[in-house]
From Swiss-Prot:
Dimer of either two alpha chains, or two beta chains, or one alpha and one beta chain. The S100B dimer binds two molecules of STK38. Interacts with CACYBP in a calcium-dependent manner. Interacts with ATAD3A; this interaction probably occurs in the cytosol prior to ATAD3A mitochondrial targeting. Interacts with S100A6. The S100B dimer interacts with two molecules of CAPZA1. Interacts with AGER. Interacts with PPP5C (via TPR repeats); the interaction is calcium-dependent and modulates PPP5C activity. Interacts with TPPP; this interaction inhibits TPPP dimerization. InterPro entries: EF-hand-dom_pair, EF_Hand_1_Ca_BS, EF_hand_dom, S100-B, S100/CaBP7/8-like_CS, S100_Ca-bd_sub. Its main location: cytoplasm. It comes from Bos taurus (Bovine). Ca(2+) 1 binds at S19, E22, D24. Small zinc- and- and calcium-binding protein that is highly expressed in astrocytes and constitutes one of the most abundant soluble proteins in brain. Weakly binds calcium but binds zinc very tightly-distinct binding sites with different affinities exist for both ions on each monomer. Physiological concentrations of potassium ion antagonize the binding of both divalent cations, especially affecting high-affinity calcium-binding sites. Acts as a neurotrophic factor that promotes astrocytosis and axonal proliferation. PROSITE patterns: EF_HAND_1, EF_HAND_2, S100_CABP. This is Protein S100-B.
Length: 92
């Protein structure tokens, strides 16, 4: 498997490690999203401690307005982070 294919599998696996702990196994609730960000993105994003920060992140990601983050919305989030990291490292 190529590095990119491994990355795709890893993204799917990480999403499903956190989704469904509290409900729909195909969506992240706010608490699941917070835990995912704090555990899996700690080198790129600050730890989320305040509920209002979680609310704002979810509001930004939740394109269909259901109050949860589905896989497509999660991937849009990953794309935003990846783009920001690319721009940061490009200037170093």
């Amino acid at each position: 498997m190529s590095e990119l294919e491994k990355a795709v599998v890893a993204l799917i696996d990480v999403f499903h490690q956190y989704s469904g702990r509290e409900g729909d196994k195909h969506k992240l609730k706010k608490s699941e999203l917070k835990e995912l960000i704090n555990n899996e993105l700690s080198h790129f994003l600050e730890e989320i401690k305040e509920q209002e920060v979680v609310d704002k992140v979810m509001e930004t990601l939740d394109s269909d307005g259901d109050g949860e983050c589905d896989f497509q919305e999660f991937m849009a989030f990953v794309a935003m982070i990846t783009t920001a990291c690319h721009e940061f490292f490009e200037h170093e």
